[in-house]
Amino acid sequence: DTIGFVFQNFQLMPRESALDNVCLPLIYAGVSKKDRRQMGMEALERVGLSDRADFKPTQLSGGQKQRVAIARAMVNHPKLLLADEPTGALDSKSGKQVLELFESLNESGVTVVVITHDRKVAEQAKRIVHIIDGEITEEGQEAGNEKEKEN
Protein backbone atom coordinates (compact mmCIF):
# COMPACT_ATOMS: atom_id res chain seq x y z
CA ASP A 1 0.00 0.00 0.00
CA THR A 2 1.18 3.51 -0.77
CA ILE A 3 0.52 7.01 0.49
CA GLY A 4 0.22 10.04 -1.76
CA PHE A 5 1.14 13.54 -0.58
CA VAL A 6 0.12 16.88 -2.08
CA PHE A 7 2.35 19.73 -0.93
CA GLN A 8 1.01 23.22 -0.28
CA ASN A 9 3.40 24.82 -2.78
CA PHE A 10 3.35 22.01 -5.38
CA GLN A 11 7.06 21.00 -5.08
CA LEU A 12 7.40 20.32 -8.80
CA MET A 13 10.83 19.97 -10.39
CA PRO A 14 11.12 23.12 -12.52
CA ARG A 15 13.25 21.65 -15.32
CA GLU A 16 11.11 18.56 -15.79
CA SER A 17 7.87 18.21 -17.75
CA ALA A 18 4.53 17.66 -16.08
CA LEU A 19 4.73 14.00 -17.10
CA ASP A 20 8.22 13.58 -15.65
CA ASN A 21 7.09 15.19 -12.39
CA VAL A 22 4.14 12.80 -12.18
CA CYS A 23 6.34 9.78 -12.93
CA LEU A 24 8.91 10.49 -10.21
CA PRO A 25 7.33 8.24 -7.53
CA LEU A 26 7.19 5.41 -10.07
CA ILE A 27 10.96 5.57 -10.54
CA TYR A 28 11.42 5.00 -6.80
CA ALA A 29 8.86 2.19 -6.94
CA GLY A 30 10.93 0.42 -9.61
CA VAL A 31 8.33 0.68 -12.39
CA SER A 32 9.68 0.21 -15.93
CA LYS A 33 10.05 3.30 -18.14
CA LYS A 34 7.30 2.12 -20.51
CA ASP A 35 4.86 1.45 -17.68
CA ARG A 36 5.80 4.74 -15.98
CA ARG A 37 4.88 6.73 -19.06
CA GLN A 38 1.53 4.97 -19.42
CA MET A 39 0.68 5.32 -15.73
CA GLY A 40 1.81 8.96 -15.71
CA MET A 41 -0.34 9.80 -18.72
CA GLU A 42 -3.34 8.07 -17.12
CA ALA A 43 -2.85 10.15 -13.96
CA LEU A 44 -2.56 13.38 -15.98
CA GLU A 45 -5.68 12.43 -17.92
CA ARG A 46 -7.57 11.89 -14.67
CA VAL A 47 -6.78 15.47 -13.61
CA GLY A 48 -7.56 16.83 -17.07
CA LEU A 49 -3.99 17.67 -18.08
CA SER A 50 -2.94 15.02 -20.59
CA ASP A 51 -2.61 17.81 -23.17
CA ARG A 52 -0.04 19.51 -20.90
CA ALA A 53 2.20 16.46 -20.38
CA ASP A 54 5.22 18.11 -22.05
CA PHE A 55 4.79 21.50 -20.36
CA LYS A 56 7.30 22.67 -17.74
CA PRO A 57 5.91 24.04 -14.45
CA THR A 58 6.67 27.62 -15.55
CA GLN A 59 4.25 27.11 -18.44
CA LEU A 60 1.38 26.06 -16.16
CA SER A 61 -1.10 28.09 -14.10
CA GLY A 62 -1.29 27.63 -10.32
CA GLY A 63 -4.32 25.37 -10.67
CA GLN A 64 -2.60 23.28 -13.32
CA LYS A 65 0.52 22.94 -11.14
CA GLN A 66 -1.62 21.75 -8.25
CA ARG A 67 -3.36 19.20 -10.49
CA VAL A 68 0.06 17.92 -11.64
CA ALA A 69 1.00 17.58 -7.96
CA ILE A 70 -2.24 15.67 -7.34
CA ALA A 71 -1.56 13.41 -10.34
CA ARG A 72 1.90 12.71 -8.90
CA ALA A 73 0.37 11.90 -5.51
CA MET A 74 -2.15 9.45 -6.99
CA VAL A 75 -0.02 7.81 -9.70
CA ASN A 76 0.87 4.90 -7.36
CA HIS A 77 -2.84 4.32 -6.60
CA PRO A 78 -2.53 5.16 -2.90
CA LYS A 79 -5.04 4.06 -0.31
CA LEU A 80 -4.37 7.32 1.58
CA LEU A 81 -3.81 10.77 0.12
CA LEU A 82 -2.61 13.60 2.40
CA ALA A 83 -3.02 17.17 1.15
CA ASP A 84 -1.45 20.15 2.94
CA GLU A 85 -3.44 23.34 2.21
CA PRO A 86 -4.14 22.14 -1.36
CA THR A 87 -6.25 25.18 -2.27
CA GLY A 88 -4.27 27.85 -0.41
CA ALA A 89 -2.46 29.25 -3.46
CA LEU A 90 -5.36 28.86 -5.89
CA ASP A 91 -8.19 31.04 -7.14
CA SER A 92 -11.71 29.93 -6.20
CA LYS A 93 -12.39 28.16 -9.53
CA SER A 94 -9.16 26.12 -9.38
CA GLY A 95 -9.75 25.40 -5.70
CA LYS A 96 -13.21 24.06 -6.48
CA GLN A 97 -11.76 21.79 -9.20
CA VAL A 98 -9.20 20.41 -6.74
CA LEU A 99 -11.88 19.70 -4.12
CA GLU A 100 -14.06 17.99 -6.75
CA LEU A 101 -11.08 15.85 -7.73
CA PHE A 102 -10.53 14.85 -4.08
CA GLU A 103 -14.22 13.96 -3.80
CA SER A 104 -13.92 11.76 -6.89
CA LEU A 105 -10.83 10.05 -5.46
CA ASN A 106 -12.65 9.46 -2.19
CA GLU A 107 -15.63 7.96 -4.03
CA SER A 108 -13.21 5.56 -5.74
CA GLY A 109 -11.97 4.28 -2.37
CA VAL A 110 -9.07 6.61 -1.54
CA THR A 111 -9.04 8.08 1.96
CA VAL A 112 -8.30 11.79 1.50
CA VAL A 113 -7.03 13.84 4.46
CA VAL A 114 -6.94 17.59 3.83
CA ILE A 115 -5.09 19.89 6.20
CA THR A 116 -6.54 23.40 5.97
CA HIS A 117 -7.21 26.63 7.81
CA ASP A 118 -10.01 27.50 5.36
CA ARG A 119 -13.46 26.83 6.85
CA LYS A 120 -15.06 26.65 3.40
CA VAL A 121 -12.65 23.88 2.41
CA ALA A 122 -13.20 22.06 5.72
CA GLU A 123 -16.98 22.21 5.25
CA GLN A 124 -16.60 20.01 2.15
CA ALA A 125 -15.29 17.15 4.29
CA LYS A 126 -17.25 14.16 5.49
CA ARG A 127 -15.49 14.42 8.84
CA ILE A 128 -13.75 17.36 10.49
CA VAL A 129 -11.07 17.17 13.18
CA HIS A 130 -10.02 20.44 14.82
CA ILE A 131 -6.45 20.58 16.12
CA ILE A 132 -5.05 23.45 18.20
CA ASP A 133 -1.41 23.42 19.35
CA GLY A 134 -1.12 19.74 18.46
CA GLU A 135 -4.17 18.71 20.49
CA ILE A 136 -7.46 17.45 19.07
CA THR A 137 -10.14 19.83 20.35
CA GLU A 138 -13.13 18.50 18.38
CA GLU A 139 -13.66 15.38 16.35
CA GLY A 140 -16.28 13.65 14.26
CA GLN A 141 -18.24 16.67 13.15
CA GLU A 142 -20.11 15.93 9.95
CA ALA A 143 -19.82 18.27 7.00
CA GLY A 144 -22.49 20.94 6.93
CA ASN A 145 -22.78 21.19 10.72
CA GLU A 146 -20.49 24.23 10.91
CA LYS A 147 -23.41 26.64 10.46
CA GLU A 148 -25.49 24.87 13.11
CA LYS A 149 -22.60 25.09 15.54
CA GLU A 150 -22.10 28.80 14.89
CA ASN A 151 -25.79 29.57 15.62
List each model region and its residues.
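ABC ATPase nucleotide-binding domains
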Residues: A143-N151
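Flexible, glycine-rich phosphate/dinucleotide-binding loops
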Residues: V121, T137, N145
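ABC family nucleotide-binding domain
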Residues: D1-I131
